[in-house]
Amino acid sequence: MPAFESFRDAASYVAVLAHESAHWTAHPNRVGRDLSRYSKDRTERAREELVAEISAALVCADLNITPELEPRPDHTAYIQTWLSVLSNDRRAIFQAAAHAQRAVNYLHSLQPQADAGEK
């Protein structure tokens, strides 16, 4: 993760942290998404990036924040690859959303539970 100071605001930092945390959940001891082809197959990379982006959106919605991320040069390429995956597989968005929800559920499970009196 880049330093906190390199982000426009706290919401933008949280959005990127949520995205990267979603990738972290893929490990077999967490939610277990198969990333073995991530570095070799652009389609598989696009699928995982969709999962991470949807996860970040869900986390931001849970926290009631709306980040304003700085555009990056690679965003266009990311979106083009996502569009290719989505147009070639009509189930892809549902699969990505399901994986994202599992990732977010796992991240939520790591949070300490509030006492009944704290709610």
Predicted regions and their residues:
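Long, well-structured alpha-helical subdomains associated
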Residues: 44, 57-119
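Active-site recognition of the HExxH zinc-binding catalytic motif
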Residues: 15-28, 52
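Active-site metal-coordination segments of metallo-dependent hydrolases
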Residues: 37-53, 66
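Hydrophobic (often cysteine-bearing) scaffold residues that line and stabilize catalytic clefts
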Residues: 14, 48-51, 96
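Alpha-helical transmembrane segments and their helix-helix packing motifs
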Residues: 28, 32-34
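Short, mixed-charge, low-aromatic patches
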Residues: 11-12, 54-58
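Short pre-active-site segment immediately N-terminal to the catalytic Zn-binding motif
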Residues: 1-16, 46
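Glycine- and acidic
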Residues: 2-5, 34-41, 82-86
